[in-house]
Amino acid sequence: MKLSKSTLIATLALTATSTNALVVQNPFSNIQQALKLDLSYDKLTSKLTDTFEQGKANIISTIAKVMNEPLDGLTPEIKNIWSEMLMKFPNSITELNFKAPPKKGKITTQQFDFHVTDAQVPNHKLRIKSTPKDLGIDTVKQYSGYLDVVDEDKHFFYYFFESRNDPKNDPVILWLNGGPGCSSLTGLFFELGPSSIDKNLKPVYNPHSWNANASVIFLDQPINVGYSYSSQSVSNTIAAGKDVYAFLQLFFKNFPEYANLDFHIAGESYAGHYIPAFASEILTHPERNFNLTSVLIGNGLTDPLVQYEYYEPMACGEGGEPSVLEPEECDGMLNSLPRCLSLIESCYESGSVWSCVPATIYCNNGQMGPYQKTGRNVYDIRTMCEGSSLCYSQLEYIDQYLNLPEVKKALGAEVDEYQSCNFDINRNFMFAGDWMKPYQKNVIDLLEKELPVLIYAGDKDFICNWLGNQAWTNRLEWSGSKGFTKAPVKSWKVGKNAAGEVKNYKHFTFLRVFGGGHMVPYDQPENALDMVNRWISGDYKY
């Protein structure tokens, strides 16, 4: 990817971000070469010319207007970071688009079987289509369609599969992929759904699908992700949560046979942001017509301040795999870590984009960049990145399949083109400062309300690695934290085989999955199914 000056920060965001969970497109070394940023900032003041100093305040003020963010509270360190960028290209930084252009779907003459509204979520409508079984994805009852937010022109696509076992009694799971900006249909066809897609673009039955003992909903959110579309834009997790609540309220109104069943929210990667926020939003609605029972987060990004400490240990031989970096590269990561953590702390304290955006840029460059230069898969430390689609060539088959006219017609899809990840959304969230915010606070809220929480992590993932996830769960300050800290780590077995390690106290569980990468159901399908089946049955101790 070539970097123009006018797309500098946008490219930083894209490079710093997402697949199914966090997306990282290109090596960070390219960014630093393009920017030639002095990340130490030690000699910044001496570099700035008098002429530049005169114009700098005006440029920063212009950016503040574009970002709709006041200048109050900027620390000297944060000012220095922005000044470093402005020094390199003072005449062109204001050309940046801090909000990506929305993706507008092509409205077609798709026919839907039902239209559902509810006074509790005004201005929302649910369209439902019975999906033909001869599409070959599964033989169970299945529905697809859209949640429409009429006045705001927002349209969220979903795909529902009934349980293969006992749909009248089995629980319901909502699955969310991350990114931010990646379609949950990736989870469907690549990880845990009823079928995968082969190179001939044909469905292949998955015996380890999570709908073995649960009905599963796959939701494309936020807007402009996957088959979802809008003329609007969204750039933060909290705003997305309100739309997800409206979707669930309407879905369970139309399908009251599922409303009284246990309901779980599961997801991975950036869903470490989504799920705590969405569950917290749901719990503020006592009038809801469904039964939120638990949440499951796999290889998530939830507490960046803790998790960013563990990129160097994971890359440098302390996570269970040999080091993939040279000693001097590991030293470089450690040297940049104190400033990284300081920037994240500023983001936690202020919540301002002025603090949170530089924290993302600096930390991703310093803590992920050296690993990315190796060409290794950020989602599986054991392998090299292959293919053009987020290190897994098979993902290209899914994109091709979901763009087949007959598939789009069968599902009622209303977009010109399906894309597994929308990197404009990724950039929007980054520029809103969402990446580095502390969503572990929402997890505390859930635990105090006695909602069961499972944090699971494949131990071969780099980008949201198990060391960081283990660390933030151990440091989480909630009423049961002392009990959780003292709880023993036990072996988790599937049959007679060791599948991982588990730590539990009351309704909070951390599970390390042996041999799993970022996408545990892809790498360990049988063990992942055992994990979810035991959890939804109420076995929180494993």
Swiss-Prot record:
Main localisation: other
UniProt KW Glycoprotein keyword: yes
Positions bound to substrate: 464, 519
Record field: catalytic activity: Release of a C-terminal amino acid with broad specificity
Gene Ontology biological process: cellular response to nitrogen starvation; macroautophagy; phytochelatin biosynthetic process; zymogen activation
InterPro entries: AB_hydrolase_fold, Peptidase_S10, Propeptide_carboxypepY, Ser_caboxypep_his_AS, Ser_caboxypep_ser_AS
Residues carrying sugar: 213, 291
Enzyme class: hydrolase
Cystine pairings recorded for this chain: 182-421, 316-330, 340-363, 347-356, 385-391
Assigned GO CC terms: extracellular region; fungal-type vacuole lumen
Entry similarity comment: Belongs to the peptidase S10 family.
Protein name, as recorded: Carboxypeptidase Y
Protein source organism: Candida albicans
Originating gene: CPY1
